[in-house]
Amino acid sequence: MNQSGTNQSSLSDSNQAGINQPSTNSLGMNQMDMNQGSASLYEMNQVDMKQPSMSQAGMRQSGTNLPDINQPDMKQPDTWQLGRSQPGMLQQELSQLVLSKAGISQPDPSQPGPSQSGPSQSRMRQIGTNQSGMSQPVMQQLDSQSGGSQPSMRQVGTSQLGTSQIGMSQPGTWQTGLSQPVLRQPNMSPPGMWQPGVQQPGISQQVPSHPDMSQPGMSQQVPSQPGIRQPDTSQSCKNQTDMSQPDANQSSLSDSNQTGIIQPSPSLLGMNQMDMNQWSASLYEMNQVDMKQPSMSQAGMRQSGTNLPDINQPGMKQPGTWQLGRSQPGMWPQSLSELVLSEASISQPGPPQRAPSQSGPRQSSTSQAGTNQSGISQPVMWQLDMRQSGGSQPSMRQVGTSQSGTSQIGMSQPGTWQTGLSQPVPRQPNKSPPGMWQRGMWQPGMSQQVPSQLGMRQPGTSQSSKNQTGMSHPGRGQPGIWEPGPSQPGLSQQDLNQLVLSQPGLSQPGRSQPSVSQMGMRQTSMDYFQIRHAEAGDCPEILRLIKELAACENMLDAMELTAADLLRDGFGDNPLFYCLIAEVNDQQKPSGKLTVGFAMYYFTYDSWTGKVLYLEDFYVTQAYQGLGIGAEMLKRLSQIAITTQCNCMHFLVVIWNQASINYYTSRGALDLSSEEGWHLFRFNREELLDMAWEE
């Protein structure tokens, strides 16, 4: 283990106050067999949080009891404890979760979890990787040089299975184990990058770590990000013996240590937040006041520009939730195809253990390891722009994987992939950055939805995920997710029903969050206007509206009716007509109401069809037209006609009122004048008198 120039003080020196990592090897610890049985994170987790048997992430510890892994009192037998997971510890067939946080590229799962890509990771070039033109800020050591990893450690012969750094084309590498069904993301890579062979069906990547384990022929094709050629992909991180990394001062956790950061579980840290000061990345300080996020605060949730701390709204308990973020990379079930955490812009091709790794307190613009592409992320699978922090890549459905339950952080249920959570509309075709088309990325079968947190803004929606300031409902315990209020207008997720993980009573899956009143949308229901049957006292108002209508039809001179006539004929023992009245609230009126419309009707008879409802007048004051009042009145009239056994409704429209003609026609009314050739005639009183008295 020749680590020239690299300071690797053990974890004990890592300034993480309060973090006692009894059994954990120094970051750089080259774990030959990766057999880190009980390298428990013991107290590595949040202060007071004991994770006794916490197996290195990625390391499938069947039978290990991860009692307090991230969730106090939570037993997670048999779980893939992602947490603190040591990327390199992936089990056989565990698809290469690859890529961890920016700067912390943990391609080869080799880097034991704690590895914190120290602030000085920048400019670390991976020897052997031809990064033509690929400037990887904080260039993750392709070899999984995540932070504390042993810069000089070189794993001879180990072909770097899981590095997948954007732009790194690893031709010929066929990552066994990735088994990425249907992963096929033709144009997934950044614009111009073509990843033809990304398919990786049925491959089984055997413990990529094991130095010297060079798996001949095993080339990691998937992660291969076109652009960078890694001819031999030999670059296995773990043992980079000669890989001196100039300037990479990796004093294990100590240098990379962020003051005040308790890196209890891999979570939190994993949250690569561009421009985000991850000062208190640890769950502890990370939690807002009163916020208990035992399981890992929304790690993985990319919150550009937001402080992790605010991620959790004060008082909000998020116990045991897959806080999308940081979806325990290591937690992926065996055979789970490379989900790619992909945190917006944080291309995380593989579930790389980004957790512990925090590249410097400030991870500004550190795009995920390997993802040096500013803005582009995760060629391979990652839903560009999807910001689907956490493994949940809507479009990425992994075939057959099921992840039942919400799986609390760290509690990855091996083999299960959150079935119930299936993210509706996973298919988000145009989510990726312009030009990047993720066709085929669908990965049928896997309904990986978990990560989807309501509050989590999907494609294009910034929604600093869980932090919507002001959006938080303090004290609202949403185990699992922050659903930005039911009516978060800006949050509306196009087509994405943003299913909520387990928001009891909080948000209904599939429910779009605009409020019922759609903010700004005119209320056209009864809370704005009321429609009722007219009473005797309404006669003056009815007369006023009749005159307005007559004036509109240029027939005001023909108006002879009085309020007394209306009272006598419409409100006696045998009414000759009936009226519906439309009112709106008006505080200036003594009654508090203003009559803005009416409909006068009566019943007649047709010798061919029977009873008919005849609509004599139908009018809404012009200032209140267009609010749905007329449509509601027409609906009421139709209901009356049906309940009174009428077979049709007749009415007249003046010939020059084309707007009304068009409206009624669009609703299905027939113009009998043209359809059947009828003419409406009328005898006035004089003619009636003449006829009545003629001899």
UniProtKB/Swiss-Prot annotation:
Q: Which residues form the N-acetyltransferase domain?
A: 529-695
Molecular function terms from GO: acyltransferase activity, transferring groups other than amino-acyl groups; spermidine binding
Keywords for the protein's UniProt record, in alphabetical order: Acyltransferase, Transferase
Q: Polar residues: which segments have biased composition?
A: 1-39, 52-68, 78-98, 123-179, 197-208, 231-266, 294-310, 355-375, 389-422, 459-471
Q: Where is the composition biased (Low complexity)?
A: 105-122
| Keyword Transferase applies | yes
Write down the SUPFAM superfamilies for this protein, in alphabetical order: Acyl-CoA N-acyltransferases (Nat)
How would you classify this enzyme at the top EC level? transferase
Instruction: List positions binding acetyl-CoA.
Output: 618-620, 626-631
The residues that hold substrate are 552-553, 650-652, 676
The UniProt entry, under Gene3D superfamilies, shows: 3.40.630.30
**Protein name (record):** Spermidine/spermine N(1)-acetyltransferase-like protein 1
Native source organism of the sequence:
Homo sapiens
